[in-house]
Curated annotation (Swiss-Prot):
Name of the protein in question: Ankyrin-repeat domain containing transcription coregulator asaA
PANTHER family linked: ANKYRIN REPEAT AND PROTEIN KINASE DOMAIN-CONTAINING PROTEIN, ANKYRIN REPEAT-CONTAINING PROTEIN-RELATED
Positions with biased composition (Basic and acidic residues): 1-10
Keyword Zinc-finger on entry: no
Amino acid sequence: MGAPHEEIQALKRRREQNRLAQRRRRDNVRRRLRDLGLDTGSPASASQTSLCSSTDSRVTLNPHQSLRSTDFLSFETSNSDTEMSPYDPPLQSKLRLDSQIPLAEISFPSYASSVSPSSSAGPLSSSPSPSQRPFIDSTDLTSLQSVYNPTSLAVHLDESSMPCGEAEIPTRQDSNFPRTPNLKSLMSGCNDPSAYQPWILTSSTVGEQMSSQALPHSPGPQHCSTPLPAETRPRWTTALHMAVSQGNFSVMRLLLSYGADPNAVNSEGATALHVGVMNGNYTMVAELLQRGADPTLTNAAGWLPLHQAVHAGDEGCVRVLLEADQPVDYPISDLDYT
């Protein structure tokens, strides 16, 4: 019970010290404002506040002085005790009353010297502020002439010869594009609607890319300097290859139980055993071997499944293939070891 009581007493002492420190700050601020004559309770400050709140305030100008700068203008700001922060005494010490500012420090632009002494104060600066600068419309061509150099633009308008609103952007000549004749020659044979024939496409199984088997020859004039690409070789695969490539063990066993050929090849000459070795799934490789997959079959490149496993550094697949009943030391020719 003693320790919490001491902590509560220490907290109360710190709170009282903070309250006294804040009170001393407020007293110092009021004393500083009283010395400057800005305290709202003093008669002098009340008279100054009434002068600042009057709407008919006038500035007496001296026409014989050089009125050039406004850097030394200072204005009085009325702050109450509730709005005054205890951390602003250095800022408030820099404020001066209008009666304390020498007239020599008040300066205006040169054109303000023609204002009569009894008139109200004119503009205080010859250069407009950022908020007073005129807005330049990007659609106005006359205002853009002073900002952009028309000689630096590749395409510009001649406003002297074109009426307003009817100017058109000139197009580039075909000589600037060296491939324009080739494009025209490619499109020259497409003008005859009777020349169009449906393309003959070979559909492959799911997941493979469709390729064009034949393209129609247009009877029109042939001016193309670049021949069309040669016919691509169609690709195909089987459902067993897809199941092995996706690592779906249950679908692979289901396909094998329904009579899928484990030695079927795809368009690259690879069996499902090759695909399993490429994916590094030695469990599926062992299941394929038990279901009758032949490890001596090579792909289109002449590689056995064992060669792919050794090339990939897959110790699990190498061990499963070496433990198979079929011989796996089938030689291959023209093997690129690089």
